[in-house]
């Protein structure tokens, strides 16, 4: 499994992954499960973590969104969840899930033509769907709802995400301030 990822994570070393994933979409995501050994355990957020697991375990409306001030630990909850998944301490419906963190910087960078952003995002969504069971984590999700929108008739990320949200094809987690 060769993952792209943000430069902030370049000094971290991914652990060996059982399944080799392939595709151009990997340059826009980082598999959090591969990096959990490099992070400290989550402490004092069990209630929020349990609630996140409950939401992800639902059959419908199963996409949690963490809202809070900067630095309160919204992303830490995602790493805590990945740690629980790797230790097999989650419900059966979440067993074996890979959590992919979307790198918005690389996804948006260089999208100078109308439709480039949508094409890249759709490739990421299709890739994550093919890697199922998977959860796509979008930090600062407010930045992409409306991104790429030029006029009333054009697509934006919200319209691209909707088909994947319907029917639980792919699970999402979001965070915003």
Regions found by a protein language model. Name each.
Residues 116-121, 146-167:
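Substrate-gripping "pore-loop 1 plus following alpha2 helix"
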Residues 1-108, 117-131, 135-143, 167, ...:
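Histone-fold recognition with a strong bias for associated Lys/Arg-rich disordered tails
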């Amino acid at each position: 499994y060769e993952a792209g990822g943000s430069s902030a994570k370049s000094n971290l070393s991914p652990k060996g992954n059982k399944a080799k994933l392939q595709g151009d979409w990997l340059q826009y995501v980082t598999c959090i499960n591969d990096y959990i050994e490099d992070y400290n355990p989550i402490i004092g957020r069990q209630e929020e973590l349990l609630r996140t697991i409950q939401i992800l375990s639902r059959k419908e409306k199963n996409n949690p969104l963490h809202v809070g001030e900067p630095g309160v630990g919204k992303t830490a909850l995602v790493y805590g969840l990945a740690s629980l998944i790797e230790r097999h301490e989650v419900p059966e419906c979440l067993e074996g899930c890979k959590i992919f963190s979307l790198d918005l910087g690389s996804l948006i960078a260089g999208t100078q033509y109308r439709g480039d952003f949508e094409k890249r995002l759709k490739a990421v969504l299709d890739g994550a769907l093919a890697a199922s069971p998977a959860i796509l984590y979008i930090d600062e999700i407010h930045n992409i709802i409306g991104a790429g929108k030029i006029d009333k008739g054009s697509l934006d990320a919200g319209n691209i995400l909707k088909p994947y949200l319907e029917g639980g094809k792919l699970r999402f987690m979001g965070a915003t301030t």
